[in-house]
Structures are given as C-alpha cells and as structure tokens.
C-alpha cells in the first residue's frame, strides 16, 4: 500500500508501470515501456527531493505486479463500473418477491370472483405475446430475404487487408474451471492469422480457480498471451472479470471469446477491414456462432439449428431493421472508446451481452452482424442445457426490468418504434415460454374436450387460432430451412420438425429463470466445457467446410435512422 500511493492505478495501467520497491532514497518503478519514462516521472506522486529509478521488466511481470498492488481496488471498481441507472446491482429480490406475492393474491381474488375474466385476460396476454414474437420473427425473416436477394458478392468494397497497419486487438477470454480445455484453446487461438505485434490475448482467470491457474502456469505461453488473475469478490460473474481485465488491455479493439471457441483464422482481418470501412458510430461487430459438435446427439442438432436461425437469419434481420441488437456472449468486437464511453459491462447481469447491446443502442451506437463464424461446443445434455438457458433468460428479464425502471428515458433514447420492438425482443422472448403451456392446452379442442376459453371463444375463434398456430409453425420451418443452407448444416434438416418439441425445454428453463430472479438473481450457472467434444483438435470439424454465404459484412438498413416511426 505504501508503494501504491505513489502512482495512481489508472496511471499505472495507462503507462505500463508499477512501483516495485526502494533503492536508498529512490523509488524503483518497473515498466515494459522505457520510452514512457518522462510520462512516468510526471505521473509519480513523490515527496520533495525524492527521485525515481526506472527499470525495465517484461510485460507479463509488470501485469502480475500491478494486480498484486492494485488488484483489490480495481476489482471493486469493476463491480460497479456500469452506470447505476443501467445496472441491475440495485435489484432487490425481497421487493420483487413482495410484488409477485401481491400479484398472485390479486389473481387468486379475481379467480374467485370473476374466473372467466381472469381466464380471458391471461389467455389474451399469452396470445398478444405469441403474436408479437411471430410478427418480429416474420419481419426479421422478410428483411433478411430481401437483403440476400439484393446482395452483390464482395469485390473489394471494404479496404484491403490492413496487415501491419491494422488496429491493435485485445482478445479477452474469461476462464473458470477450464483445465481440460485451456491448452486446446491456445492451439485454436494460434491459428488466428493476424500480426502478432498487433494482437494480445488476455486469459482472465479467477484467483480461487487454482486448477486452471496451475494448468496455465505450466503451459508455454507465447509472448502475445498474458494471464490476468481476478481477485475474489462479489458477484463472481463473467462481466466482472471482463471489466477487471479491460484495464490491462492495450488494444483499440476489444474482442471476446469463450474458452471452447474456435474462430475462423481470418476473422480478425475481416473485423479490422469492416471497422476501417464503417463509421465511428459502428461500435460493435457481432460474428456468427456455430457448433463443431452439432452431430453429437439430437439435442446438439436442434441447438445448432436454433443458432443457425438466430445468427444467420433473425439477428441480421434485426440489425437491418435498425433495432437494438442483443449481443452474443462471444465473437463480438467493440471499439474500446465506445465501450468505455457507455461504462463497460454490468458486473451483476448474467446476460451482460444482451444488456450491453441495448445500452449501445441507447447511446446512439450501431452494431453490425459480420459474416465470419466461430465454432463452439454445443451443450448436449438436457439438465446443463436448461441451466444455461435459464441463465440467459434470467439475464433477459433483468435487462428488461432495469431498462423499464425509467420507461420515459428508454422511449426517449430508442424512439417509439424501437421501444415497442424491444418489448418483443427482450420481454416477450421469455414471457412467450412462460405462457406457452396456456396455448398448448388448446390442443385438446380438436378432440371435443371442454376448455376454460369456451365461455368467450366460439368455433370460429378457435379456427382462427388454429390457423395462426399452423402458420407460425410453417414460418419457423421456412426460417430453419433458410438458415441451414450452408453445406455443413444441411444434414441437420431432417430434424427441423422436432424444433417445436425442443422448445418445450425452454419453458422449463424460463420458469427456472423466473424463480432465480427472486431467489438467486446474480448467481452465474457455470456451463461446463469439454464434455461434448470441446477438446477436439484445433483443426477438426466443420470450421474447415466452405460456407456458401459471402464473407462480406452484412449491410445495415439503419444508417443512423432513429425510429421516431421507423429505425
């Protein structure tokens, strides 16, 4: 602590310097950038008459010493880095439980007094959510179809490969209890075809994760890879670790990968070219995600189809419509200046990616979906799948609840159209699964079984509902067929009709997410990697199969349009 007072943490990180001791009356300061000696001297807070002695040390040693000296203070900053009005750290489960209890009591009272009214209201809400989700899906699909038909193959639209003049990338890879996959990860990242002097990879590990730290300690790390050890604290989440590591990154572009990821080798070059061509308002590029173990079992096949639908059809459509883009947790690349301007990640949100995408949109930034793919490991067992999906859905609910604390501000930031669309994108995405059993109950009507809705819905009404449900299923199948055009995905098409059954699991996870909102709002359900093929060779699998879709970044239909009617 006595050494730390001579150099502020922010200055130490910015200057790649750290006080390490004393030599007589001189303060010894180590740095890996001796060219910054003058700036280091200027930043030091020394008593009158005391001097500093600058010494040179490797960057990895500088980083480790900075963490030892400033780590606890930086960790506390990481926990509260996001602006209070955008953060869920003020979420009070007891207050939410009280509101839920009051709602349940009122519902029970209505059920006793006017049961038909309650039935009509609940089923009406379920139908509104269903129609909202279907409309958003249809609009995104139609937008993607129109754009694909107009698309011209890439012929040098973006600048040439930046080579040695490209931006410096800092790739953050959070690891927690990943001893089996850590060495495989290094092999996969080594395939990235980008100048090493303009690339650094920060492996972010928790202080108490002794197993992963031991594996990394024995690994032979290249000079462009560093280990960042995050001090213990609360909450123990991925966004907290990312906030902590951000201060140690030196790149102007911040990229995020997960432990099991295998990005395409030219991914960073594509991202660099697109950032060079896009304006400064384009703050984020989101890559596509796919699975290298899609054929592990039926669940992994259906999961791969869902990912193809999301990243190859719906998300590009959402982007072209000018709506807020809920980011994926990996293969996203951010301009550092924009990331810092919006306050980094919310350390308490367990779906930090979607929340950050919304916050970028609220601050006037754009996100583009870029046609480059990272292959990762599909969760191929039912219970782990439900745990993972519940975490995502809990984060969506939390993101919506925080944003709607001030609906007028959200309306002002997004505009009317994007405000309405956000309700479907975030709230309806979870509410649809919570209420789905109500709509499933209508399946008994073709068999002449009585239903509580019979009092308010006649035969014609049931016919209209049946038509809507069949049309929705047909739309989903059409989107899935479109999403699986790539050669390595076509083999998944025979199981597309089973997707409706697959989403039954999402209803189970949605109810678990709702319960966790009240009981364990900040708990991070860890996804285990390596159990379903995550440790296969770096070059194996479908990543080497040519994808027929052009590598050109997807154009945006937004172009700074704000939906005060249409974004």
Model-predicted segments: where are they?
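Polyanionic, low-complexity intrinsically disordered segments
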Residues: 1-47, 59
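Long helical/loop segments within the catalytic core of UDP-sugar-dependent glycosyltransferases
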Residues: 217-252, 265-350, 390-401, 502
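Cell-envelope/extracellular polymer assembly enzymes that use nucleotide-activated donors
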Residues: 167-170, 200, 340, 355
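N-terminal signal-anchor transmembrane helix
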Residues: 135-197
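Cytosolic-side membrane-insertion boundary helix
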Residues: 65-103
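Acidic donor-binding segment of Leloir-type glycosyltransferases
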Residues: 190-233
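Membrane-embedded multi-pass helical conduit in multi-pass membrane proteins
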Residues: 110-161, 424-519
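Catalytic donor-sugar/metal-binding loop of nucleotide-sugar-dependent glycosyltransferases
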Residues: 357-375
């Amino acid at each position: 602590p006595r050494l730390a007072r001579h150099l502020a943490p922010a200055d130490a990180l910015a200057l790649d310097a750290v006080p390490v001791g004393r030599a007589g009356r001189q303060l010894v300061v180590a740095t890996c950038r001796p060219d910054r000696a003058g700036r280091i001297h200027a930043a030091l807070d020394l008593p009158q008459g005391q001097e500093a002695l600058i010494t040179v040390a490797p960057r990895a040693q500088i980083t480790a010493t900075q963490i030892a000296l400033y780590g606890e203070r930086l960790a506390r900053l990481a926990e509260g880095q996001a602006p209070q009005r955008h953060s869920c750290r003020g979420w009070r489960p007891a207050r939410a439980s009280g509101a839920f209890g009051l709602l349940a009591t009122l519902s029970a009272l209505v059920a006793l007094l006017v049961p038909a009214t309650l039935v009509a209201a609940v089923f009406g809400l379920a139908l509104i959510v269903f129609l909202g989700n279907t409309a958003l899906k249809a609009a995104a699909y139609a937008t993607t179809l129109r754009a694909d038909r107009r698309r011209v193959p890439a012929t040098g639209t973006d600048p040439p490969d930046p080579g040695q003049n490209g931006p410096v990338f800092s790739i953050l890879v959070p690891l927690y209890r990943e001893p089996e996959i850590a060495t495989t990860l290094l092999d996969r990242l080594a395939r990235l075809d980008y100048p090493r002097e303009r690339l650094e990879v920060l492996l972010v590990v928790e202080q108490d994760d002794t197993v992963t730290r031991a594996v990394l300690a024995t690994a032979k790390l290249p000079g462009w890879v560093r280990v960042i050890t995050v001090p213990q604290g609360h909450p123990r989440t991925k966004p907290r670790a990312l906030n902590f590591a951000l201060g140690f990154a030196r790149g102007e572009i911040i990229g995020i990968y997960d432990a099991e990821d295998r990005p395409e080798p030219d991914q960073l070059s594509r991202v660099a070219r697109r950032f060079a061509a896009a304006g400064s308002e384009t703050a984020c590029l989101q890559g596509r995600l796919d699975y290298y173990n899609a054929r592990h079992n039926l669940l992994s096949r259906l999961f791969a189809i869902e990912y193809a639908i999301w990243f190859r059809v719906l998300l590009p459509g959402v982007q072209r419509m000018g709506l807020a883009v809920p980011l994926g947790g990996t293969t996203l690349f951010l301009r550092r200046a924009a990331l810092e301007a919006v306050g980094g990640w919310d350390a308490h949100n367990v779906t930090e990616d979607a929340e950050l995408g919304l916050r970028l949109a609220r601050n006037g930034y754009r996100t583009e979906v870029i046609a480059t793919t990272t292959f990762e490991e599909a969760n191929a067992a039912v219970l782990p799948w439900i745990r993972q999906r519940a975490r995502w859905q809990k984060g969506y609910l939390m993101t919506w609840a925080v944003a709607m604390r001030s609906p007028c501000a959200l309306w002002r930031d997004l505009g009317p159209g994007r405000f309405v669309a956000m309700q479907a994108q975030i709230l309806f995405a979870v509410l649809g699964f919570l209420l789905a059993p109500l709509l499933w109950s209508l399946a008994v009507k073709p068999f002449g079984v009585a239903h509580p809705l019979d009092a308010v819905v006649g035969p014609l009404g049931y016919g209209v509902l049946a038509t809507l449900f069949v049309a929705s299923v047909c739309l989903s199948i059409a989107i899935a067929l479109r999403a699986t055009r790539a050669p390595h995905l076509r083999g998944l098409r025979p199981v597309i009709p089973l997707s409706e059954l697959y989403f039954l699991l999402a209803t189970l996870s949605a109810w678990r997410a709702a319960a966790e909102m009240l009981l364990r709002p900040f708990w991070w359900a860890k996804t285990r990697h390596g159990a379903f093929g995550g440790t296969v060779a770096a070059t194996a699998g479908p990543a080497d199969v040519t994808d027929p879709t052009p590598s050109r970044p997807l154009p945006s239909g937004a172009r700074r349009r704000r939906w005060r009617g249409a974004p």
